[in-house]
């Protein structure tokens, strides 16, 4: 591929362009197709399931080729990008009619997973983010950009754990890292990871690029002047965005500094376990967002997900949102607001496309409809008694001039693209109307001229015609040609006729022959002018879009509060949680029968709840429900409870579920311990910690020891608010040993050898775990269940026969039994005894203890040995 002389001029052109874009798949425009060659063609054929063919030869071998029609290329490109590929769009920019050699082509745009703005490529209810990471030791600068809206944010993160949390929160579509970035294991699962040269992260260059983009002298006004690492990341990101878009980015006007301490922090494991907007299978069903999202607009849905993923710690801001929700609830004001917002649509992304000059006719039609809805929306907001809503209404404003412009300029139902015209409305531009009239009505015009000239001249053989060589003409038979008026100019003499032209017909000819192309050019020019006029007000329009998205979330919260019977939580400076009749917001929607609500009380005297109870009794649901109520409250939403009073929360941790990390080479137990270690290192007294089945992934004694020590550390050293679910009933002793720990349990009852889960939470420890009954429900064969019951009876008998100790020893509720010594030996390996108790010495041990080894004779020693052997046999 390097010796260009062996290739045709067209392939030489392609190879030169491909050499400039080695990391992108080049979509090379050839007439009505985009063609791909060599490895790009092979990859496209595999990913898109299209035919792989060949064109010409290279080194004696056919050149692989694949292609897609240009008019349907968007769908193919979208599939490639979703697979993590980057696409270089190479268009014909020269005129084939005038080109000598290959038509001039150039790459006009690079489409990458993180720089999408076209509606066809984007998921409408989720952000599509480009991110960049710059590191120094274990400190990280992080930047993110949504090019489809202009949101640009930076932060500095103090640990790898914090970086993982941000990646899990934002889920960027594309991530830029330096060539020497060493922590690639945390990027497992992200498809669009791109390594960039270290010079692209250089601090002076980065600062210059950012200040030029934002049109400022420094970053003091954005609070980012001291964020060296974040600025390096942001500079690389911005350069990459400009390179891919090949145009200015005027919609990127602000830089937001995100501070972790401003939000309730959730680490990566907690986000996964709580299923905020992605379930454990990677889908979106049965998540918190799935329940909470009834927003009217896609931009509102995206804002909602930002709120759910980043609850606020600033209680005043939370109360401001909550008060706005209450005001929208009063008199059901949210209902007309919701209906009007549906007419507004996703103007946030439309405005970004306006800024990038890639907005399509239907974008402008939707923008027109949105502007028409704003006056009615302002009327609907007037009775809402909320200072915050008033502020939002002021920012939203009205745009009558733009509404009028778009009403006059764009037809009601425009085509998808401007390419073929038919977008600008009749009456908007006199010249365009005339050109269209000429182009569309040329035939009728010529008939009218023919009729008029026959009447004027009285020549019956007169007719008007056209040919490609001579254009338009008036033809008169040879017999009547001498009657031609003086204003007729002879154009052509035929055997039986003369052809003439008139000044009027010549003028029409000049217009008609170029009318269609001139009309299209005129229409495109007018369309660009309309885009430019809208873009002139980009800044206030973007602010209005943000305010509309926030209003959408608030009205959505009001609707959810009504439909789901949520109540407004109260906030206090005093630590703790007091929830009456709390419910799990997602599980409640999935049940056919009513959800069983439960109370939650945690205060300075109840910092740890040790939760026991049957398998499937609802322990995990109860714990997650507590976390989701706290999360919803700190977003400004109402919560699923009759009453809720919440103290300060700085972080929410969860150690729940079990799965190994095959890619990372970590066992289930290693994953569990890693998550536990993270909690023990980072939790504070204001953290809410959910611990489910700690220690179950290893041997009984190891697991119990770790669970006990972990619970003690959380309760005594950190003093955080902990829900600690366990099947180690020994841990119920913690309530007696620790000042702030209490036992609670989930109830169940047995009926006709089956189990009924009551799902009620009561104080005190559970009596048993009903493991065999749950196994029966799961379909474990009956002979296995019977054998398990036999083994359980023996184990419980061993436990009942052991020496009592001050620490609890029961695994299940004791049932007296007396197994034989031989049977005891056979089950010794699985007996879950008391790790803190000393067993009573056996008869053999007592006899050995009495022996005087220094005074015994060899014969007596031998006799004693026989006696001991006899005792052991008994």
UniProtKB/Swiss-Prot annotation:
GO terms for biological process: mismatch repair. InterPro entries: DNA_mismatch_repair_MutS, DNA_mismatch_repair_MutS-lik_N, DNA_mismatch_repair_MutS/MSH, DNA_mismatch_repair_MutS_C, DNA_mismatch_repair_MutS_clamp, DNA_mismatch_repair_MutS_core, DNA_mismatch_repair_MutS_N, DNA_mismatch_repair_MutS_sf. SMART domains: MUTSac (SM00534), MUTSd (SM00533). Keywords: ATP-binding, DNA damage, DNA repair, DNA-binding, Nucleotide-binding. Gene3D superfamilies: 1.10.1420.10, 6.10.140.430, DNA repair protein MutS, domain I, MutS, connector domain, P-loop containing nucleotide triphosphate hydrolases. The keyword NAD does not apply. GO terms for molecular function: ATP binding; ATP-dependent DNA damage sensor activity; damaged DNA binding; mismatched DNA binding. The keyword Membrane does not apply. It comes from the Bacteria. ATP binds at residues 613-620. Residues 799-820 are annotated as: Disordered. PANTHER family: DNA MISMATCH REPAIR PROTEIN MSH1, MITOCHONDRIAL, DNA MISMATCH REPAIR PROTEIN MUTS FAMILY MEMBER. This protein is involved in the repair of mismatches in DNA. It is possible that it carries out the mismatch recognition step. This protein has a weak ATPase activity. Belongs to the DNA mismatch repair MutS family. This is DNA mismatch repair protein MutS. It comes from Marinobacter nauticus (strain ATCC 700491 / DSM 11845 / VT8). The gene is mutS.
